[in-house]
Curated annotation (Swiss-Prot):
Designated name of the protein: Enhancer of mRNA-decapping protein 4-like protein pdc1
Location (main, coarse): cytoplasm
Function (record text): Involved in P-body formation. Acts as a functional homolog of human EDC4, which plays a role in mRNA decapping in the process of mRNA degradation. Enhances the decapping activity of dcp2. Together with edc3, acts as a scaffolding protein sufficient for the phase transition of the components of the 5' to 3' mRNA degradation machinery to form P-bodies. Intermolecular interactions between the edc3 Sm domain and at least 10 helical leucine-rich motifs in dcp2 and pdc1 build the core of the interaction network of this spontaneous clustering process.
Biased composition (Polar residues): 70-82, 153-173, 185-195, 669-688
UniProt-annotated location(s): Cytoplasm, P-body
Residues modified as Phosphoserine: S671, S673, S1075
Biased composition (Basic and acidic residues): 695-706
Species annotation: Schizosaccharomyces pombe (strain 972 / ATCC 24843) (Fission yeast)
């Protein structure tokens, strides 16, 4: 059967007139064909009516209408779907969730955001539906169409909105994955890639490996200039790039480390939402962590303890720090630490968080110039959130360090013995890592008195070279085979300059400068900087060129022979300070591998261990299209035995070589920002760089100190309860003081009046006594009288004051007793109410949990019964079909599809004939129903074609005599082989017949829908051989599937929705092409 016969047969089945002239030049007879009578298929299934005649007019009317007035919204909506094969196939599989999986939240599409799916350059690796569920974690799509409209599943709560399919906000019940070859879904997805891709990728990426020739050391700095525009970079191969989540986002300077992994979990922040998704790598199970405020998260980090692996740190846009304890088994989490965010301008906004090395219990948080160290085991009885005030934090079990000036960043050494800070003046301060956390301020040193053990600087200018860039980040790194972190990598603004500082030789030994074209900042470079200490690899991103660079130490290089092997970084630094002789530094970066990200702008990245393989180097990346992970063969990063390009490095004798600053050094010309720390930087002198901007933390230092006493954030919860009582007592004491003073003045005035009234009588008595007694006796008597009067006056005054105080104190005592009694009663009543409410809530939760467990048990029992019944039904149907074929009963054979029409050559009816419709209907078919012998013969030929690999002949044979048994034989041919070997016309005929096939069991229905989706996505609508039939065939296929959907299971109804979208998109594409 040639293509012209195939086209005529298809047009005859569709009741379309044949064309007068075929596209290949052969003549074709124009004819019309009558409607066929209902076949056995229609007799057995009355709900699937063969309405070709009525459908034909409907299709023609719809096609004409679409050609005259094409819709503006339809083609635009489906254009993105039809342009990406992989995206539609992924969405098609998303509907096939395994039994027992909870449906996710309904996802709404934003009109303002891009609707384009993943790049069609991404690899399509077919995996099982279970693994796809675990890989993509996508929510369920819309339900079965009702009256031509797609209805969303309103029974589920919406977790968040996104322009892409987002993960569900409910815990996914883990299905049975025992059939999968690997326990890790991501490993399955990676291993299913094209085996030819890695070899090609390695050949291409070999061009982007550079070797630096910089032997020896001296009084100079090895300097390398990298021009990304001219630098040879290679893109990641398809087999190296895989999606974790697809989320459209815009660049935000606040975004930092948006995704992080450990050996067990993946965590990433959802764009514009206060949500973090946590995924278990081994099972693919995931659930959501919610912020207790409406602010999105900008940084996440797992603790790196080898035992406690479920603690996740998160920071939001206000600087709030949260630590979650994740329980993936129960899909629950607990906040075990919370430091509140900034509430005013006086509060430091930025929070810089670091876990202790190899710990999930101890960590440090930097707020402006303060660094606070905590231990979670000592914070069990602390109420959260913790205020963002240093005064409040000092009351907690912690350790504080005042760096004197706002440190840009800090980092722990890999062995955890020291940590380093770097500020805007390029000062590197080395401190010992605290191991004790006193509970009160009097048990710990004053934060400003904690001194560093060493201070280094990268700015010791020589000659005309003046480096005015401000450092923004630093990381420790060690050479392969050593236990200490000998080197510091300092990064300047936008990663334009990278300096390698040797702590042992106390100077800069190597610099890299990126020579980018002047462009606006595309994204923050703070997060595009990472160190993999286990592989001694530095990862640096270059935002203007959207590329990443791997810096590696040479494999054959070890620590300098002049430097003994120290067991810790602390010992190395002490030995460095005690060494006055110059020490050569010969261990430098010797290999650079340059890679480039495609399209989506990179935001952050970090090394990970998603793949448990020593042969692959993995990183996770967040970009403007979502989250991905990349795996690079370690053989590419190993330059041994390979020819790589050479990159020029020069010996710069005028570069900043750096050095050590004496801890006892003081400079009178130091700037105010450095006076607080007790040190002066080389730049702070008159000839140094100008200080045009004050540090942000210093600008509000005075205001913070003056307002901290009155600020609400400076009080704890217990202090707030004591404020009303303090005010009452102070008011009472003030009134008491006024009353005592008033009584004292009154008594004093009375005594003066009494003395004045009796003064005359006293003088008369004294004169008589003095005249009658001797002089001495009179003086003695006068003294006795005076003392008696003084005693009497003092006793009278004391009694008056005592009585006044007694009355006032009794009033105060009674008032306090009444107030305290009322307060106790009110607190007791509130406590009783809260206790009863909590008891009722606990009882309700227990009832709900019990009911949920019962419903789950019932659901599992019903599910097992349904599966058993389905197995019985399938067994009976198979036996029934086998019996029908063996008995050779043509009248009841359901395998014959009601699409067998007489061939075009046997019809003598033409378009120009005047034969009436009744005469056409009276014509008998040229051939009778096919006998069972014909079906058996067709099955024999199909098996021979399949065995011989004749794909085209096999499909043509089945289209000539379609049957269910023949479809089972035909389904052994893979989709890709069928698409490669069959023409568009043959494929179109094939999907027409399988859409009318009378079989709705799960296996055959799944294969039918897969064939239709594949052919729909790959058919060329511009092929002139099918341009007259492609629209009716696709429309008829769509209507046939809708009529049969009544007997579909819920799973296949969801898959049908996605398939109908693909058909509608292709039909809209045809309409747009015809209108143009």
């Amino acid at each position: 059967m040639n293509e012209q016969d195939l086209l005529n047969s298809l047009r005859r089945d569709l009741n379309l007139p044949n064309l007068g002239k075929s596209h290949d030049g052969s003549e074709a007879v124009e004819s019309t064909f009558p409607e066929k009578k209902e076949s056995s298929l229609s007799a057995q299934q009355p709900h699937v009516d063969d309405q070709r005649s009525s459908l034909l007019s409907l299709l023609n009317a719809g096609l004409n209408a679409s050609n005259q007035s094409p819709s503006n919204s339809g083609p635009k909506y489906y254009a993105s779907h039809s342009s990406s094969t992989d995206a539609l196939l992924q969405a098609f599989r998303d509907g096939a969730k395994p039994s027992g999986t909870a449906s996710g939240a309904d996802v709404k599409r934003s009109d303002s955001e891009s609707t384009e799916a993943t790049s069609n350059e991404r690899p399509f690796n077919p995996v099982s539906a279970a693994n796809l569920e675990r890989l993509l974690m996508s929510s369920t799509g819309p339900q079965t169409p009702i009256n031509g409209e797609l209805k969303s599943n309103d029974s589920q709560d919406t977790a968040f909105q996104s322009s892409r399919n987002m993960p569900s906000d409910t815990s996914v019940a883990s299905p049975d994955y025992s059939h999968s070859q690997s326990s890790s879904p991501i490993a399955n997805y990676q291993e299913s890639g094209n085996s030819e891709e890695p070899h090609k990728a390695e050949e291409q990426q070999q061009l982007s490996i550079y070797q630096l020739d910089n032997p020896g050391s001296g009084n100079y700095v090895w300097e390398t200039v990298i021009s990304p525009d001219k630098f040879e970079t290679s893109t990641f191969a398809k087999c190296e790039r895989n999606d974790i989540a697809i989320i459209n986002r815009e660049l935000d300077a606040q975004d930092n480390q948006l995704i992080h992994t450990n050996e067990d979990f993946i965590a990433y922040a959802v764009h514009r939402e206060p949500i973090i998704r946590v995924i278990e790598i081994s099972t693919g199970k995931s659930f959501l962590l919610h912020n207790n405020s409406p602010n999105k998260f900008v940084s996440v980090a797992w603790g790196n303890d080898s035992v406690i692996k479920n603690r996740l740190m998160a920071i939001d846009t206000t600087g709030q720090v949260l630590i979650f304890a994740v329980d993936i088994a129960t899909s629950t989490s607990e906040i075990i630490f919370q430091l509140s965010g900034a509430q005013s301008l006086s509060d430091p906004i930025k929070s810089r968080f670091h876990w202790y090395p190899k710990s999930s219990t101890r960590f440090a948080v930097a707020l402006s110039k303060h660094i606070i160290f905590f231990d979670l085991d000592l914070l069990n009885n602390i109420s959260f959130p913790i205020p963002r005030s240093i005064n409040a934090i000092q009351q907690l079990p912690c350790f504080l360090i005042d760096t004197g000036i706002s440190a840009k960043e800090y980092d722990f050494s890999y062995d955890g013995t020291v940590f380093a800070t770097v500020d805007k003046d390029a000062l590197i301060k080395i401190y010992t890592v605290p191991t004790t956390f006193p509970s009160t301020p009097d048990k710990r040193p004053v934060p400003s008195e904690v001194s560093p053990i060493a201070i280094f600087t990268t700015r010791m200018e020589r000659g005309p070279s003046k480096n005015y860039e401000k450092p923004i980040n630093l990381r420790f790194i060690s050479t392969p085979g050593t236990n200490n972190s000998r080197y510091l990598v300092i990064v300047y603004v936008m990663n334009q300059l990278i300096t390698l500082f040797d702590l042992y030789s106390k100077r800069n030994i190597q610099t890299f400068r990126f020579n980018n074209r002047p462009t606006a900042a595309t994204t923050t470079s703070f997060s595009q900087f990472s160190v993999d200490n286990e592989r001694s690899t530095l990862l640096v991103g270059n935002p203007p060129s959207n590329s990443i660079y791997f810096f590696l130490f040479a494999k054959d290089e070890t620590v300098s022979e002049q430097a003994p092997i120290y067991n810790s970084t602390y010992e190395l630094i002490l030995a460095s300070l005690n060494t006055s002789e110059p020490v050569p530094a010969d261990a430098k970066f010797s290999v650079i591998v340059a890679k480039k990200f495609e399209k989506a702008a990179c935001i952050s990245f970090t090394a990970c261990k998603i793949l448990e393989s020593e042969d692959k180097y993995c990183i996770v990346v967040s970009n403007t299209d979502g989250y991905e992970y990349y795996s690079i063969p370690t053989s590419i990063l190993d330059k041994t035995g390979k020819t790589v390009r050479s990159l020029e490095s020069v010996q710069n004798y005028d570069a900043d070589i750096g050095g050590t600053i004496d801890l006892t050094e003081r400079h009178s010309t130091a700037s105010p920002s450095t006076v607080n720390s007790g040190f002066s930087t080389p730049r702070s002198q008159a000839t140094g760089f100008s200080k045009k901007k004050k540090d942000k933390g210093e600008r509000f230092e005075t205001k913070d100190k003056s307002s901290s006493v009155l600020s609400p954030s400076s009080y704890s919860a217990s202090t707030f309860d004591a404020i009303p009582m303090d005010s009452i007592v102070s008011n009472i004491l003030a009134s008491l003081e006024k009353s005592v003073h008033k009584n004292y003045e009154s008594l004093r005035s009375q005594l003066l009046e009494y003395k004045a009234a009796n003064e005359k009588h006293t003088e008369a008595i004294l004169s008589v006594v003095s005249s009658t007694l001797t002089e001495n006796t009179g003086k003695i008597l006068e003294s006795v009288v005076e003392k008696s009067m003084q005693v009497a006056l003092k006793e009278e005054i004391a009694n008056s004051v005592r009585n006044a105080l007694k009355n006032n104190l009794e009033k105060i005592e009674s008032f306090l007793e009444n107030s305290i009694a009322e307060l106790q009663n009110s607190v007791r009543e509130d406590f009783d109410k809260q206790t009863s409410s909590l008891a009722q809530l606990r009882y309700s939760i227990q009832n709900v949990a019990h009911a949920q467990k019962e419903s789950e048990v019932k659901y599992n029992e019903l599910n097992e019964q349904v599966k058993t019944l389905e197995g019985y039904v399938e067994t009976v149907l198979e036996k029934f079909n086998d019996l029908k074929i063996e008995n050779k009963v043509p009248e009841t054979a359901p395998d014959v599809v009601p699409s067998s029409y007489p061939p075009a050559a046997e019809s003598n009816v033409s378009v120009s004939s005047d034969t009436s419709t009744k005469d056409v209907e009276k014509q008998e078919p040229s051939s009778a129903e096919q006998p069972a012998q014909g079906i058996a013969e067709s099955l024999r030929r199909l098996k021979e074609y399949v065995k011989a690999g004749s794909v085209k002949e096999c499909v043509a044979e089945w289209c000539n005599m379609p049957s269910v048994a023949g479809f089972d034989v035909l389904s052994e041919i893979s989709y890709d082989r069928m698409l490669e070997n069959c023409s568009n016309l043959l494929l179109l005929t094939f999907i027409y017949h399988i859409s009318l096939l009378d079989s709705v069991d799960d296996d055959r229905l799944s294969k039918r829908m897969e064939y239709i989706s594949r052919i729909c996505l790959n058919i060329d609508v511009n092929d002139p051989k099918v341009e007259t039939v492609v629209h009716p065939v696709l429309t008829l296929t769509r209507e046939a599937l809708l009529r049969q959907s009544e007997f579909f299971s819920p799973i296949f109804k969801r898959r049908l929705v996605v398939l109908l979208r693909a058909l509608d998109g292709k039909i809209s594409e045809i309409s747009v092409a015809s209108s143009n």
